[in-house]
Amino acid sequence: MLSPEELRHYQRHVSLPEFGSEGQARLKAGSVLVVGAGGLGCPALQYLTAAGVGRIGICDFDVVEESNLQRQVLFGYSQIDRPKVEAAAERLTDLNPHVSLEPHPERFSPENAERLLSDYDVVLDGSDNFPTRYLVNDACVMFGKPLCFGSIFKFEGQVSVFNYQDGPTYRCLFPKSPNPQDVPNCAEIGVIGVL
């Protein structure tokens, strides 16, 4: 059920006959874990929050750096050296106070995967390295969670949704992880901020 304040806040959604208050209530009842609060996670977090997804987890172990600011649009100079999950949650709460934001200031790992995934309906992987992508995929398959995946490389981007029940997974698409020495990172090759 939506409060009068939420009905006002989401009025443009609710006005759509195909969506209405029922659609908004479904978003409010939903939950998403976003792994990575970087160049992919930041815009995803903004839109999930603005749309009114009821509960959003933010998993990242990193701090805001000046080099992040040209593409990680949640952050500003005043947040440099702060944990990304804290800075993101603060900004997102200001964007939409009707959403519950849950910071997880830790690296996604085999030891915490079940605990992190268990309470969320969907997982969005915005991580920036192959070991984490494979781990998130495998955990989603193991614990029965749909996975939204995105990645960027210089001027290119990829996005996909993997459903553990009746479709291929990230590991099906890319069976073998590339050698870490063969894969440059954003600091080495650059990345455009508008993807």
Regions found by a protein language model. Give the residues of each.
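Adenine nucleotide-associated cytosolic modules
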Residues: 1-195
